[in-house]
Structures are given as C-alpha cells and as structure tokens.
C-alpha cells in the first residue's frame, strides 16, 4: 500500500510528533522524552503510536531535572500517563 512506501501519510494534520519514548518504567507508567520547543502540560491529551497501533491518554505528571512541573517545552523530561505504554512509542500532541 502507499503508506508502507512512504508515499502518503495517514497522520492527522492537527497532530505533531513530540518524540519517542527512549526509556519506559511500568511503575509509575512513566516514559522519558527529549523535547525541542513542544509544550506539554499536566492534563493534556497525548497520542501514542507503535506498530500501527494508536493510543490516546492524558498526562498525569511531568518531571524536569527530578522536580515536578506543570508544563515544559524543552529538555529531557519524564511524563506519567494514565495508560501504560512502553519504550519505542512515538508521542504526538494535537495542535490547538
């Protein structure tokens, strides 16, 4: 099919890629991302994709430099979600 060859993208136009979970910890459902000018905040919905499977979940908490923060847009951060994911998930957010 055309999407397998990279000729078309089925990614909705209102989603932007944040990054890939570089590490994942089952407890407390936390993933590590490196952000580059993409705003994440507690309560925001994120969309995760791996092997063609999409999951929608919300951010429960965010850590930057081992401190809890309400929002962040740069750096290596840890985010806790309400649904368990795993290493390798691509993370997306909706453009408002």
Regions found by a protein language model. Give the residues of each.
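Beta-strand/loop-dominated core regions that host nucleotide or nucleotide-derived cofactor-binding catalytic loops
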Residues: 11-96
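Catalytic cores of secreted or luminal carbohydrate-active enzymes
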Residues: 1-8
């Amino acid at each position: 099919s055309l999407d397998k060859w990279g000729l078309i993208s089925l990614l909705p136009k209102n989603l932007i890629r944040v990054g890939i979970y570089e590490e994942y910890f089952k407890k407390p459902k936390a993933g590590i991302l490196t952000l580059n000018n993409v705003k994440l905040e507690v309560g925001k919905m994120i969309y995760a994709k791996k092997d063609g499977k999409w999951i929608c979940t919300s951010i429960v908490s965010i850590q930057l430099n081992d401190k809890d923060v309400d929002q962040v847009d740069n750096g290596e951060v840890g985010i806790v979600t309400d649904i368990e994911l795993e290493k390798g998930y691509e993370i997306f957010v909706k453009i408002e």
